[in-house]
Swiss-Prot record:
NCBIfam families: GSH_gloB, PRK10241.1. Monomer. This is Hydroxyacylglutathione hydrolase. It is an enzyme of class 3 (hydrolase). Gene3D superfamilies: Ribonuclease Z/Hydroxyacylglutathione hydrolase-like. CDD domains: hydroxyacylglutathione_hydrolase_MBL-fold. Belongs to the metallo-beta-lactamase superfamily. Glyoxalase II family. It catalyses: an S-(2-hydroxyacyl)glutathione + H2O = a 2-hydroxy carboxylate + glutathione + H(+). InterPro entries: Clx_II_MBL, Glyoxalase_II_hydrolase, HAGH_C, Hydroxyacylglutathione_Hdrlase, Metallo-B-lactamas, RibonucZ/Hydroxyglut_hydro. Pathway: Secondary metabolite metabolism; methylglyoxal degradation; (R)-lactate from methylglyoxal: step 2/2. Thiolesterase that catalyzes the hydrolysis of S-D-lactoyl-glutathione to form glutathione and D-lactic acid.
Length: 251
């Protein structure tokens, strides 16, 4: 299968997987127009849509796409049932698309019903995990988000993390503010800065590398613990995650 990214709005990415026959899967189409343009340019035949959560910048294009291609099956969590979903899926279930099984993973935090889809090596994680960061807590708790991103972090090393936003540069600036002397973070920041200066995408990222540079995935790292302990003594990784999320919200 071929992985394609379609820019939308200011910083969204709509992901499309296509097979050799031209059948395709569309993930979180917040806007129909760029998707329709890509379909026409590549002669794709849409088979399915995956929705991760109910926010408009992820579901806004569904209605128009379904009107154009009525055969499309729209998979999504319960919270997207009024956004065009025709097949509600939940944690532990699978969606069979393009000849592949995609596992559904519940990841509450950004929204309460947020889900992700995984079929090795592809992880479509919506607004749960970003390169260098994680989603804001609009509905869920820090505890829920901590558990959610750790579920994703446990996936295979070679997983391709397909995030829904180009937030990498700002996330790495935050990471540097927390761990300014970390070599992995500094190296990745320079790489990301160069890519964005050329208006190039920083995604997808390999999960093995992401674990090294994402401070939200390093809550048991001694360097991070020492930094946090300078301000407050927190015994549990979950508490350290909440501290980081609060810092990022104010960054």
């Amino acid at each position: 299968m071929n992985l394609n990214s379609i820019p939308a709005f200011d910083d969204n990415y709509i992901w499309v997987l296509n097979d050799e026959a031209g059948r395709c899967l569309i993930v979180d189409p917040g806007d129909a127009e760029p998707v329709l343009n890509a379909i026409a340019a590549n002669n794709w035949q849409p088979e399915a849509i995956f929705l991760t959560h109910h926010h408009h910048d992820h579901v806004g294009g569904v209605k128009e796409l379904v009107e154009k291609f009525p055969q499309i099956v729209v998979y999504g969590p319960q919270e997207t049932q009024d956004k065009g979903t025709t097949q509600v899926v939940k944690d532990g279930e699978t969606a069979f698309v393009l000849g592949h099984e995609f596992s559904v993973i519940a990841t509450p935090g950004h929204t309460l019903g947020h889900i992700c889809y995984f079929s090795k090596p592809y992880l479509f994680c919506g607004d749960t995990l970003f390169s260098g960061g994680c989603g804001r807590l609009f509905e869920g708790t820090a505890s829920q988000m901590y558990q959610s991103i750790n579920k994703l972090s446990a996936l295979p090393d070679d997983t391709l993390v397909c995030c829904a936003h180009e937030y990498t540069l700002s996330n790495m600036k935050f990471a540097l503010s927390i761990l300014p002397h970390d070599l992995s973070i500094n190296d990745y920041y320079r790489k990301v800065k160069e890519l964005r200066a050329k208006n190039q995408i920083t995604l997808p990222v390999i999960l093995k590398n992401e674990r090294q540079i994402n401070v939200f995935l390093r809550t048991e790292d001694i360097d991070l613990i020492n930094v946090i302990n300078e301000e407050t003594l927190l015994q549990q990784p979950e508490e350290r995650f909440a501290w980081l999320r609060s810092k990022k919200d104010r960054f």
